[in-house]
Amino acid sequence: MTEKTSIHIIGVEPEGVNPSRAPLSDYLSKTALVIGGKRHLEPLREVLGKEVEFLGITSNIPEVVARLLRFAEESKPDKNAIVLATGDPLYYGIGAPIAAALPAGSFSVHPATTLVQRSFALLGEPWEKVSVGSLHSKKESPKLHPGRWAFYTGGSAGVREVCTLVLEKGFGIRKMALLEEIGMAGERVRHFEKVETIGILPDDVKALNMVVMTIEEGSGNEK
């Protein structure tokens, strides 16, 4: 971080935003722009007031990047922009496209624990050999192979999308865990010893979820 750093990309724990906790609390007094998901922004609206600009993150990544580029060009040393994202923003998060677009030295990154970490803590499993995939992007599917996997999903249909992808590639699924609303009041973990068809999957899946599974070689898996 340098004196020119005016944009701060801050990871948030799944429990939510805490305005009184560093590093967020270190920057709020000079904040002019806050970017984040709906549940990240709401706790800060009353704290920061109407003079601060709020921009929600949905599927509008180009808009977010363009707004931060304008903020960096405005070069106001007494003002900050804050970007809030769950976990580590540079790990399957909004931080990657922002870091690729912004000038070097114009931003800092403050990671929180990732949802992968939190998932395996709940399961009581080591995860240093786990492969990670994401279904947030529709442009490229994870390159599957046998082993223990964790998947970031795109919502309540995510577990079906993951299982469909794996089964259609001819692999088997064992020891699957569906982890919902990690760190929140509605936290829930459901286990499935074996998944041979998506018909056994529940319909009441919460939108914020992770899927952990062991992918096994199948008789007809695609190479």
Task: Describe each model-derived feature in a short phrase.
Residues V52-F54, G124-E128, E193-E196:
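Short, hinge-like loop/turn segments at secondary-structure boundaries
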Residues V109, P126-S131, G172-M176:
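Short, structured loop/turn "capping" segments at alpha-beta junctions
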Residues M1-S108, Q117, K139-S141:
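Class I S-adenosyl-L-methionine
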Residues M1-K4, D26-Y27, K76, L102, ...:
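Solvent-exposed alpha-helices and their adjacent loops that cap or buttress functional pockets
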